[in-house]
Swiss-Prot record:
Involved in urease metallocenter assembly. Binds nickel. Probably functions as a nickel donor during metallocenter assembly. Coiled coil: none annotated. Its main location: cytoplasm. GO terms for cellular component: cytoplasm. Residues 170-190 have a biased composition (Basic and acidic residues). SUPFAM superfamilies: Urease metallochaperone UreE, C-terminal domain, Urease metallochaperone UreE, N-terminal domain. It is found in: Cytoplasm. Belongs to the UreE family. It comes from the Bacteria. This is Urease accessory protein UreE. It comes from Burkholderia pseudomallei (strain 1710b).
Length: 203
Protein backbone atom coordinates (compact mmCIF):
# COMPACT_ATOMS: atom_id res chain seq x y z
CA UNK A 1 0.00 0.00 0.00
CA UNK A 2 1.34 3.39 -0.95
CA UNK A 3 1.65 6.12 1.65
CA UNK A 4 0.76 9.74 0.92
CA UNK A 5 2.90 11.87 3.20
CA UNK A 6 3.39 15.28 1.60
CA UNK A 7 1.25 18.19 0.42
CA UNK A 8 2.66 20.55 -2.18
CA UNK A 9 2.46 24.17 -1.07
CA UNK A 10 -0.33 26.12 -2.81
CA UNK A 11 2.17 28.67 -4.16
CA UNK A 12 4.09 25.98 -6.06
CA UNK A 13 2.96 25.98 -9.67
CA UNK A 14 2.60 22.62 -11.38
CA UNK A 15 1.82 21.89 -15.01
CA UNK A 16 -1.96 21.64 -15.40
CA UNK A 17 -1.66 18.50 -17.54
CA UNK A 18 0.46 16.82 -14.86
CA UNK A 19 -2.13 17.52 -12.17
CA UNK A 20 -5.01 16.50 -14.44
CA UNK A 21 -3.43 13.08 -14.99
CA UNK A 22 -3.01 12.47 -11.25
CA UNK A 23 -5.56 10.16 -9.61
CA UNK A 24 -8.09 11.86 -7.37
CA UNK A 25 -8.61 11.36 -3.65
CA UNK A 26 -12.23 12.37 -3.04
CA UNK A 27 -12.98 13.12 0.61
CA UNK A 28 -15.74 14.77 2.64
CA UNK A 29 -14.81 17.67 4.90
CA UNK A 30 -14.45 15.63 8.10
CA UNK A 31 -12.08 13.21 6.36
CA UNK A 32 -10.03 16.10 4.95
CA UNK A 33 -9.42 17.24 8.54
CA UNK A 34 -7.70 13.96 9.46
CA UNK A 35 -3.94 13.69 9.15
CA UNK A 36 -4.00 9.88 9.53
CA UNK A 37 -6.46 8.08 7.29
CA UNK A 38 -6.92 4.88 5.32
CA UNK A 39 -8.49 5.97 2.05
CA UNK A 40 -9.26 4.81 -1.46
CA UNK A 41 -8.33 6.71 -4.60
CA UNK A 42 -10.93 7.13 -7.32
CA UNK A 43 -8.99 4.48 -9.25
CA UNK A 44 -9.85 1.94 -6.53
CA UNK A 45 -6.35 1.83 -5.04
CA UNK A 46 -6.14 1.77 -1.24
CA UNK A 47 -3.67 4.25 0.24
CA UNK A 48 -2.56 5.45 3.65
CA UNK A 49 -2.68 9.17 4.35
CA UNK A 50 0.06 10.24 6.79
CA UNK A 51 0.35 14.02 6.89
CA UNK A 52 1.58 16.48 9.54
CA UNK A 53 -0.91 16.77 12.38
CA UNK A 54 -3.29 19.68 12.00
CA UNK A 55 -3.32 19.47 8.20
CA UNK A 56 -6.68 20.31 6.64
CA UNK A 57 -6.90 19.38 2.98
CA UNK A 58 -8.77 21.55 0.52
CA UNK A 59 -10.28 20.85 -2.86
CA UNK A 60 -7.54 21.16 -5.46
CA UNK A 61 -4.61 20.38 -3.14
CA UNK A 62 -1.89 18.22 -4.67
CA UNK A 63 -0.29 15.48 -2.58
CA UNK A 64 2.81 13.37 -3.09
CA UNK A 65 2.99 9.64 -2.40
CA UNK A 66 6.08 7.86 -1.10
CA UNK A 67 6.92 6.75 -4.65
CA UNK A 68 6.90 10.35 -5.91
CA UNK A 69 3.55 10.09 -7.70
CA UNK A 70 1.04 12.94 -7.46
CA UNK A 71 -2.48 12.69 -6.06
CA UNK A 72 -5.04 15.50 -6.30
CA UNK A 73 -7.62 16.19 -3.61
CA UNK A 74 -11.29 16.57 -4.51
CA UNK A 75 -14.05 17.65 -2.13
CA UNK A 76 -16.80 15.04 -2.03
CA UNK A 77 -20.48 15.86 -2.26
CA UNK A 78 -22.05 15.61 1.19
CA UNK A 79 -25.21 16.66 3.01
CA UNK A 80 -25.13 20.40 3.60
CA UNK A 81 -27.43 23.27 4.47
CA UNK A 82 -27.67 26.25 2.13
CA UNK A 83 -28.66 29.32 4.11
CA UNK A 84 -30.09 32.40 2.42
CA UNK A 85 -31.95 35.40 3.79
CA UNK A 86 -34.26 38.16 2.53
CA UNK A 87 -31.78 40.84 3.58
CA UNK A 88 -28.16 41.32 4.60
CA UNK A 89 -29.01 41.88 8.27
CA UNK A 90 -30.73 38.50 8.62
CA UNK A 91 -27.85 36.71 6.90
CA UNK A 92 -25.36 38.52 9.13
CA UNK A 93 -27.31 37.48 12.23
CA UNK A 94 -27.30 33.89 10.98
CA UNK A 95 -23.53 34.03 10.50
CA UNK A 96 -23.11 35.55 13.97
CA UNK A 97 -25.06 32.78 15.70
CA UNK A 98 -23.24 30.09 13.74
CA UNK A 99 -19.96 31.72 14.72
CA UNK A 100 -20.99 31.66 18.38
CA UNK A 101 -21.28 27.89 18.02
CA UNK A 102 -17.91 27.61 16.27
CA UNK A 103 -19.65 26.00 13.32
CA UNK A 104 -17.52 25.64 10.18
CA UNK A 105 -19.15 27.78 7.48
CA UNK A 106 -18.47 28.26 3.79
CA UNK A 107 -19.27 31.82 2.79
CA UNK A 108 -20.67 32.47 -0.67
CA UNK A 109 -22.29 35.39 -2.45
CA UNK A 110 -25.51 35.88 -0.50
CA UNK A 111 -25.38 32.35 0.88
CA UNK A 112 -23.85 30.40 3.77
CA UNK A 113 -23.13 26.69 3.57
CA UNK A 114 -22.64 24.36 6.54
CA UNK A 115 -22.74 20.66 7.31
CA UNK A 116 -26.27 19.31 7.61
CA UNK A 117 -27.61 19.66 11.15
CA UNK A 118 -31.39 19.67 11.78
CA UNK A 119 -31.00 21.56 15.06
CA UNK A 120 -29.09 24.38 13.38
CA UNK A 121 -31.53 24.33 10.48
CA UNK A 122 -34.38 24.92 12.92
CA UNK A 123 -32.50 27.73 14.66
CA UNK A 124 -31.70 29.45 11.37
CA UNK A 125 -35.30 29.21 10.23
CA UNK A 126 -36.42 30.86 13.47
CA UNK A 127 -33.96 33.68 12.76
CA UNK A 128 -35.77 34.34 9.49
CA UNK A 129 -33.36 32.63 7.12
CA UNK A 130 -34.32 30.26 4.32
CA UNK A 131 -32.66 26.87 4.77
CA UNK A 132 -32.34 24.25 2.04
CA UNK A 133 -30.83 20.80 2.39
CA UNK A 134 -28.58 19.87 -0.52
CA UNK A 135 -25.74 17.61 -1.59
CA UNK A 136 -22.64 19.59 -2.49
CA UNK A 137 -18.90 19.85 -1.82
CA UNK A 138 -18.19 21.63 1.47
CA UNK A 139 -15.14 23.82 1.89
CA UNK A 140 -15.48 26.15 4.90
CA UNK A 141 -13.37 29.19 5.63
CA UNK A 142 -9.78 28.13 6.25
CA UNK A 143 -7.74 28.69 9.36
CA UNK A 144 -10.50 29.21 11.90
CA UNK A 145 -11.32 25.78 13.22
CA UNK A 146 -8.07 24.13 14.23
CA UNK A 147 -8.19 21.38 11.64
CA UNK A 148 -11.89 20.81 11.93
CA UNK A 149 -12.06 20.41 15.71
CA UNK A 150 -15.10 22.22 17.04
CA UNK A 151 -15.62 23.05 20.67
CA UNK A 152 -17.02 25.68 22.97
CA UNK A 153 -14.75 28.23 24.61
CA UNK A 154 -16.95 28.83 27.60
CA UNK A 155 -19.29 26.97 29.91
CA UNK A 156 -22.37 28.19 28.07
CA UNK A 157 -21.62 26.45 24.78
CA UNK A 158 -23.05 23.04 25.68
CA UNK A 159 -26.02 24.65 27.40
CA UNK A 160 -26.67 26.89 24.41
CA UNK A 161 -26.59 24.00 21.95
CA UNK A 162 -28.63 21.78 24.28
CA UNK A 163 -31.29 24.47 24.54
CA UNK A 164 -31.48 24.79 20.77
CA UNK A 165 -31.72 21.03 20.45
CA UNK A 166 -34.44 20.86 23.11
CA UNK A 167 -36.49 23.45 21.25
CA UNK A 168 -36.02 21.47 18.05
CA UNK A 169 -37.01 18.20 19.74
CA UNK A 170 -40.12 19.71 21.28
CA UNK A 171 -41.10 21.22 17.95
CA UNK A 172 -40.50 18.03 15.94
CA UNK A 173 -41.29 15.38 18.54
CA UNK A 174 -38.07 13.40 18.51
CA UNK A 175 -34.55 13.58 19.88
CA UNK A 176 -31.03 13.38 18.57
CA UNK A 177 -28.05 11.73 20.20
CA UNK A 178 -25.53 14.32 19.13
CA UNK A 179 -23.62 15.72 22.06
CA UNK A 180 -20.77 18.14 22.68
CA UNK A 181 -18.31 17.43 25.45
CA UNK A 182 -15.46 19.78 24.64
CA UNK A 183 -16.55 22.91 26.44
CA UNK A 184 -14.06 24.44 28.87
CA UNK A 185 -14.71 25.32 32.50
CA UNK A 186 -12.69 28.53 32.50
CA UNK A 187 -13.88 31.99 31.64
CA UNK A 188 -12.70 33.23 28.29
CA UNK A 189 -12.84 36.85 27.29
CA UNK A 190 -12.86 37.54 23.56
CA UNK A 191 -11.57 40.93 22.62
CA UNK A 192 -8.90 42.70 20.62
CA UNK A 193 -6.19 40.72 22.41
CA UNK A 194 -7.75 37.33 21.70
CA UNK A 195 -5.20 35.33 19.72
CA UNK A 196 -7.39 32.46 18.56
CA UNK A 197 -8.00 33.86 15.10
CA UNK A 198 -11.72 33.13 14.96
CA UNK A 199 -13.91 34.38 12.14
CA UNK A 200 -17.32 36.04 12.09
CA UNK A 201 -16.19 39.01 14.17
CA UNK A 202 -17.70 37.76 17.42
CA UNK A 203 -16.31 36.89 20.87
Amino acid sequence: MRTIDKRIAPNVRLAATLVARAPALTLAYDARCKSRLAATLDTGEDVALVLPRGTVLRDGDVLVADDGALVRVAAAHEAVLLVRAPDALTLTRAAYHLGNRHTPVEVGAGCLKLEYDPVLADMLTRLGATVERASAPFQPEAGAYGGGHRHGHDATFAEDYALAQQVFDEHHGHSHSRSHDHDHDHDHQHGPSCSHGHHHGHR
